[in-house]
Amino acid sequence: MKRSIPELLQSEQPLVMVTAYDYPGGLHAEAAGVDMILVGDSLGNVVLGYESTAPVTLSDMIHHSKAVRRGAPQTFLVVDMPFGTYHTGVTDAMRNAVRIIQETGADAVKMEGSTPEVLQVVDTLSRNGVPVVGHVGLMPQTATAQGGLRVQGKDDDTARRTLEGALALEAAGAFCVVLEAIPARLAKLITDRLQVPTVGIGAGINCDGQVLVTHDLLGIYEGEEKKIAKRYAEVGRVSREAIARYADEVRRREFPTRENSFVMKDDVLDKLY
């Protein structure tokens, strides 16, 4: 059964969140019993083949989120608001967030940053019944302005801004805050200071929950394992090997076999000659 926001807030165990981008992703995540599913704009990187999340559109997010919801009707669903959908004013942000909730069946939206403009959006959405997940630390949508995809909060300035940003998001009405790629001790400090849950990715063990990109934890893409993730399977290698075996059997005329084929009666076939 889907957990409500109060139930998530009162959880005594660490919250488990994974990403999903399609029907089977939602299906498997729900069957595994995760607490929350995030349809992240990371779909731009891991599904659509973009170099960043910037090209991902609102239509992309809605399309993929609807598929995830069909696969996971009973899991709390959070949908990223992609770049540009909450940066042009509160009215536009409200309209876009309502579209996401109405068209996908999502339970909450997520947005990055803690600028005054973003905080105003968070405040307006939360006061109007749209639950919001905040996000501080490394923010992929604007990573170029942060000096690239690298750890945040290791110096006095960025550590203080990260802490203050998380506190400001809570004050604005965010019911949960994602902490990405920050030192573990900073994440613990933020978690201790906040009354709402923190969900970490590359933020150490002391957050109230953890999130991973499913493609990372399944090993869908082969190569070096990311520092912030752990590979629990080798789905990429297994998939490649399976497709190669299929191709080999087709070329050797070993597939399909009789077991994979349909039959017909001799007299029916004879009438065709």
From Swiss-Prot:
<feature type="binding site">
    <location>
        <begin position="41"/>
        <end position="42"/>
    </location>
    <ligand>
        <name>3-methyl-2-oxobutanoate</name>
    </ligand>
</feature>
<dbReference type="InterPro" id="IPR015813">
    <property type="entry name" value="Pyrv/PenolPyrv_kinase-like_dom"/>
</dbReference>
<dbReference type="GO" id="GO:0005737">
    <property type="term" value="C:cytoplasm"/>
</dbReference>
<keyword id="KW-0808">Transferase</keyword>
<dbReference type="InterPro" id="IPR040442">
    <property type="entry name" value="Pyrv_kinase-like_dom_sf"/>
</dbReference>
<comment type="pathway">
    <text>Cofactor biosynthesis; (R)-pantothenate biosynthesis; (R)-pantoate from 3-methyl-2-oxobutanoate: step 1/2.</text>
</comment>
<dbReference type="GO" id="GO:0015940">
    <property type="term" value="P:pantothenate biosynthetic process"/>
</dbReference>
<keyword id="KW-0479">Metal-binding</keyword>
<dbReference type="InterPro" id="IPR003700">
    <property type="entry name" value="Pantoate_hydroxy_MeTrfase"/>
</dbReference>
<feature type="binding site">
    <location>
        <position position="110"/>
    </location>
    <ligand>
        <name>3-methyl-2-oxobutanoate</name>
    </ligand>
</feature>
<feature type="binding site">
    <location>
        <position position="41"/>
    </location>
    <ligand>
        <name>Mg(2+)</name>
    </ligand>
</feature>
<feature type="binding site">
    <location>
        <position position="112"/>
    </location>
    <ligand>
        <name>Mg(2+)</name>
    </ligand>
</feature>
<dbReference type="Pfam" id="PF02548">
    <property type="entry name" value="Pantoate_transf"/>
</dbReference>
<feature type="binding site">
    <location>
        <position position="80"/>
    </location>
    <ligand>
        <name>3-methyl-2-oxobutanoate</name>
    </ligand>
</feature>
<keyword id="KW-0963">Cytoplasm</keyword>
<feature type="active site" description="Proton acceptor">
    <location>
        <position position="180"/>
    </location>
</feature>
<dbReference type="GO" id="GO:0000287">
    <property type="term" value="F:magnesium ion binding"/>
</dbReference>
<keyword id="KW-0460">Magnesium</keyword>
<comment type="similarity">
    <text>Belongs to the PanB family.</text>
</comment>
<comment type="function">
    <text>Catalyzes the reversible reaction in which hydroxymethyl group from 5,10-methylenetetrahydrofolate is transferred onto alpha-ketoisovalerate to form ketopantoate.</text>
</comment>
<keyword id="KW-0566">Pantothenate biosynthesis</keyword>
<dbReference type="GO" id="GO:0003864">
    <property type="term" value="F:3-methyl-2-oxobutanoate hydroxymethyltransferase activity"/>
</dbReference>
<comment type="subunit">
    <text>Homodecamer; pentamer of dimers.</text>
</comment>
<protein>
    <recommendedName>
        <fullName>3-methyl-2-oxobutanoate hydroxymethyltransferase</fullName>
        <ecNumber>2.1.2.11</ecNumber>
    </recommendedName>
</protein>
<feature type="binding site">
    <location>
        <position position="80"/>
    </location>
    <ligand>
        <name>Mg(2+)</name>
    </ligand>
</feature>
